[in-house]
């Protein structure tokens, strides 16, 4: 008797989508739907609404729900993996239930981050959200959350059935090998654009990506070459894109990626407060790197 493997919709290039805002900072849902469809048409495998790049922290509950529904309508639920982060476990579970009702294939979840949660609290948090019934991808971002999903804790979460993959944003590529030793069935996803090749070579199964919002085709080409082990193709492209990719690990990543989108003819636009515009020096650096990528035919 053969069994069909469970789908893993987080594999491949999933874009943590930037959210188009009008001049009055209202969400432009039509532009967002078009953007999601454009990303998939240009080779990306899916979208991740309501991540940090999508400014979920400054959305109303109604806006946050509608963003998910808009993405599902644009590209199909199996391609949509929304972020469901919240200060409380019950609220995060409600967002996971909303994602399930909208037809999403999985959800992405940060650990508790209202305080420096210990291991018992982290496990309880993920267990609560897993009860919503969708596969959960853990998101490890100890830089911002101050809670580190170390390999041993990830192995426990996976072993207890609470998570099926992890978006790894610690920047420590050595962890890839320890995670594979402790939890070989836990899918590792590249979480920071500027360690893409390093984690791809280490066995990553997907990339939750920022810069494909502006440069989808070149980003997908880079990812495919890297996971195939074709470093002769990947490394020259990586070097050309890295001046942009490294912005994904900076505090100003939302503003930088939105500016690059504007430069290549997409609609990045403004950010909601408390994010402020880039400084003139930052804007010049992003603009120069983006224009260089455009001139090289990467847009």
Model-derived features with residue positions:
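Catalytic alpha/beta core domains of metabolic enzymes, predominantly
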Residues: 132, 143-251
């Amino acid at each position: 008797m053969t069994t069909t493997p469970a789908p893993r919709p987080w594999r491949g290039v999933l874009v943590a989508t930037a959210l188009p805002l009008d001049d009055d900072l209202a969400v432009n849902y039509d532009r967002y739907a078009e953007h999601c469809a454009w990303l998939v048409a240009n080779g990306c495998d899916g979208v991740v609404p309501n991540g940090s790049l999508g400014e979920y922290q400054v959305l109303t509950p109604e806006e946050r729900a509608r963003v998910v529904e808009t993405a599902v309508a644009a590209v199909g639920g199996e391609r949509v993996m929304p972020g469901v982060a919240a200060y409380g476990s019950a609220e995060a579970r409600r967002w996971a239930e909303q994602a399930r009702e909208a037809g999403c294939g999985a959800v992405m979840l940060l650990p508790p981050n209202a305080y420096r949660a210990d291991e018992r609290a982290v496990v309880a948090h993920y267990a609560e959200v897993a009860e919503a019934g969708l596969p959960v991808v853990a998101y490890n971002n100890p830089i911002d959350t101050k809670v580190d999903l170390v390999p041993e804790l990830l192995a426990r979460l996976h072993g207890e059935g609470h998570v099926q993959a992890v978006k790894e944003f610690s920047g420590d590529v050595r962890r890839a090998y320890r995670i594979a030793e402790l939890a070989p069935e836990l899918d590792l996803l590249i979480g920071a654009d500027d360690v893409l090749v390093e984690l791809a070579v280490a066995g990553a199964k997907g990339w939750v990506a920022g810069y494909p919002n502006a440069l989808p085709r070149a980003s997908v080409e880079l990812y495919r070459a890297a996971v195939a082990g074709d470093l002769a193709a990947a490394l020259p492209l990586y070097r050309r894109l890295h001046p942009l990719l490294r912005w994904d690990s900076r505090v100003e990543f939302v503003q930088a990626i939105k500016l690059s989108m504007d430069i290549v003819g997409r609609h990045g636009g403004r950010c909601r407060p408390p994010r402020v515009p880039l400084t003139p020096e930052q804007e010049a650096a992003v603009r120069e790197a983006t224009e260089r990528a455009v001139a090289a035919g990467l847009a």
